[in-house]
């Protein structure tokens, strides 16, 4: 009986997150803890480029940045406690929310806020008739 050889399904490689940015990142800052935490697993090991999707050039830069951050005691050599990782993620979300609010405030003129308040009809209660 003939053996059936099955092909592995083609899985598209994730694009490098550093190459996708408008200005390609040439230096990955070791002081940027929030970004480096995403590239390290719970045991503190550097995630492979196959998992993170980084290209070879940026993977080498990521490894160097993580090693520098460990040496400078920004990242621990062993894994982060889940509580610490959650706090870092929350801090990062707060920063992103502040950036979004600032961009909305700068884009939105003050007059439009007043105009939207005037255009809304005021709600009144109807008197009950018995």
UniProtKB/Swiss-Prot annotation:
One Pfam family per UniProt? Ribosomal_S18
GO biological process terms on file:
translation
> Per UniProt, which keywords does this protein have?
Ribonucleoprotein, Ribosomal protein, RNA-binding, rRNA-binding
Residue ranges annotated as compositionally biased, kind Basic and acidic residues, are 98-108, 117-130
Tell me, what is one Gene Ontology molecular-function annotation carried by this entry? structural constituent of ribosome
- Mind telling me which SUPFAM superfamilies this protein's record contains? Ribosomal protein S18
Q: Which domain of life is it from?
A: Bacteria
Q: Name one GO cellular component term.
A: cytosolic small ribosomal subunit
InterPro entries linked: Ribosomal_bS18 (IPR001648), Ribosomal_bS18_sf (IPR036870)
Region labeled Disordered — which residues? 98-130
Signal peptide position in this chain?
Answer: none
Q: Which family does it belong to?
A: Belongs to the bacterial ribosomal protein bS18 family.
Quaternary context: Part of the 30S ribosomal subunit. Forms a tight heterodimer with protein bS6.
Known PANTHER family for this protein? 30S RIBOSOMAL PROTEIN S18 (PTHR13479), SMALL RIBOSOMAL SUBUNIT PROTEIN BS18M (PTHR13479:SF40)
User: What function does the entry list?
Assistant: Binds as a heterodimer with protein bS6 to the central domain of the 16S rRNA, where it helps stabilize the platform of the 30S subunit.
Q: What is this protein called?
A: Small ribosomal subunit protein bS18
Q: Which gene encodes it?
A: rpsR
């Amino acid at each position: 009986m003939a053996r059936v050889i099955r092909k592995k399904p083609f899985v598209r490689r994730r694009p490098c997150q550093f190459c996708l940015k408008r200005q390609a990142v040439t230096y990955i800052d070791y002081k940027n803890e929030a970004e480096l935490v995403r590239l390290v697993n719970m045991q503190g090991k550097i995630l492979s480029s196959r998992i993170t999707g980084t290209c070879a050039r940026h993977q080498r830069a990521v490894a160097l940045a993580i090693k520098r951050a460990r040496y400078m005691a920004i990242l621990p050599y062993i894994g982060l406690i889940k509580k610490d990782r959650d706090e870092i993620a929350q801090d990062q979300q707060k920063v992103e929310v502040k950036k979004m609010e600032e961009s909305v405030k700068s884009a939105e003129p003050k007059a439009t806020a007043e105009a939207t308040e005037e255009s809304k009809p005021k709600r009144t209660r109807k008197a009950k008739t018995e």
